Amino acid sequence: MSKIFMIRKLQENDIDIVMKIWLDTNIKTHNYIDSSYWIENYNYVKDAILNSEVYVYVDNSTLCGFIGLSNNTIEGIFVKSDMQSKGIGKMLLDYVKNLKDNLFLNVYQKNTYALKFYQREGFSIQSQQVDVSTNEIEYIMLWKC
């Protein structure tokens, strides 16, 4: 990771890279969910991303990660696997924290790495529910300014 980076709004020509990061990261991170789930939802998510508030992290003209929002709900933070644990997710999260007074998100109970990350960043668990599409327990978390 260099000192020449920027966070900017998603551009339409970013979508193929963003979707590759989305698919690769979900399959790797959520190994308790069959990969066919992510593949089957690919086109739906692609359309949703193109119609959402999405910010990308670009390092030396290479797109390395993104964060997607729907109003005040974080739909996900995704960083290329070889760029993880370098502070990119935190920078993306801090960027949107400066835009919003509060943020919600859902995170799978089994995704302990993400759960700890969000708690460290000031999110607290509000409730839990079962994601009907995966039958996995997820926490609903909140951050307030």
Residue ranges and their predicted role:
Residues 53-65:
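Conserved beta-hairpin
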